[in-house]
Regions:
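Carbohydrate transferase catalytic cores enriched for Leloir-type hexosyltransferases
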Residues: 1-167
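Single conserved hydrophobic/aromatic residue that forms the stacking wall/gate
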Residues: 165-176
Length: 176
């Protein structure tokens, strides 16, 4: 199986989301060595921890292919990455940091999203209004369209059900 990852945070983030993303890819590549893993990143950042993932023979890093998409990386990651996923034969896509590409459910590619927290809904006073609107749309969309949802804690799982009104069934919701 070919598994694609939204690896933006694995490459560009050196704390929580980045550590989680790198851990997931490393663990999957180590114990699921019969599969191939594609890490999709909007741009290459200098990151030795990310680069060490490429030592696995079954892991590769994918950047936007066209010069236009290299300039409009956010659009590529949100809307246009699907074309590359299909060209690369990806069968499962994991949004490691709360997001999925728009329309992925129409591609035939199964999807998983990891939700880390909904702190922007719990404590909205600490977030700009526009950021809350964007996060709310992205998180809601991902939870509605994903084949599986991974909640990083029981608290996050409860928040997903309570604040995003997403039932744990019929799609499974797992706590990592």
């Amino acid at each position: 199986m070919i598994i694609g990852f939204d690896a933006k945070r694995a490459n560009a983030n050196f704390t929580g989301l980045g550590n989680y993303s790198r851990f997931m890819v490393d663990t999957m590549a180590t114990y699921g060595d019969e599969h191939k893993y594609r890490m999709y990143i909007p741009k290459q950042c200098k990151n030795a921890s990310y680069d060490s993932l490429l030592k696995h023979k079954n892991v590769s890093s994918i950047l936007p292919r066209s010069s236009v998409m290299k300039r409009f990386r956010a659009l590529w990651r949100t809307f246009f990455i699907k074309r590359g996923l299909l060209q690369d034969g990806v069968q499962l896509y994991h949004g490691l940091s709360n997001e999925l590409p728009v329309g992925i459910h129409r591609t035939g590619i199964r999807s998983v999203v990891t939700i880390h927290d909904l702190i922007f809904l719990r404590y909205p006073q600490y977030y700009h209004r526009l950021d809350r609107i964007i996060y709310n749309r992205k998180f809601n969309y991902a939870c509605r369209k994903a084949d599986r949802i991974v909640a990083v804690s029981e608290c996050t799982k409860r928040d997903i059900v309570c604040l995003l009104y997403t039932s744990p069934s019929p799609r499974d919701m797992r706590r990592s």
